[in-house]
Amino acid sequence: MKKKNEILSVTFARRIALMTVCMIGVAGTMQAQQPEKVGGKNRTQWGVKAALNIASLDFDASNGKSESTKSVLGGAVGLTFAYAFNSNWRINSGLEMSMKGFSADETGGSRELTVHAAYIQAPVTCGYVINLGKWNFEPRLGAFFAYGVAGNYSLSGADSKQTFSDKLLNPFDAGLAFGLYADNGKIVFGIGGEFGLAEANGKKFSVSGGTVHTRNTFLSVGYLF
């Protein structure tokens, strides 16, 4: 089983890398073949972002019931990229460092488990731009791909341990990403969520009778160059 999980993880990582390379190649090809501007604005836009994360885990039991852990506050910073197909449709991506986690009471005990996890993350979403005067409003829907690189966890009164190297959480995560954004051509505000679809718990996080997935709600602000 261990070898099988390692093979699946490597395969998943390769698919993420291949998809990223393909996206860069397609965007580069499209940029070379089409005019640089759409509606008087640059077809390609780069930017930076910062976000407040409200993260948790969701447990989907085999009996159909769903329970969530307590939330923890985190954050995200990164680079953003947008490519406009026309004046309405565009694809959004980027690369960011995102801090997530959760807090939960120990089963059958009085201690509390607190987990912090840092991911390198690449969201890929498609958006439809609605122009209202000086502001653009853009609902987005797509996916996110993440790999855990750092973090720690601890039970009340105990020493902290490493979240991923100690295999509390699975470092690979991916799922649905969605949000509503507003920009004036330079400043971007956003609110949205992420629903992880990959199995989140590692070998030292035993869960019976269901599956565990990451959840995150975020508020973001960005600047477009």
Annotate each language-model stretch with its function:
Residues A32-G74:
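Short glycine/proline- and aromatic-enriched beta-strand/turn motifs that initiate or cap beta-hairpins
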Residues P35, C126-Y128, K134, G157-K161, ...:
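First exposed extracellular module after export/assembly in secreted or surface-exposed proteins
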Residues G40-Q45, L52-D58, A82-Y153, N216-F225:
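Gram-negative (and chloroplast) outer-membrane scaffold detector with strong preference
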Residues N42-T44, T69-G75, H116-A122, W135, ...:
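Residues that define the transmembrane beta-barrel architecture of outer-membrane proteins
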Residues S62-E67, T107-T114, K161-D166, K203-G209:
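Extracellular loop and loop/strand-boundary signature of outer-membrane beta-barrel proteins
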Residues R140-A174:
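Charged, low-complexity C-terminal accessory regions
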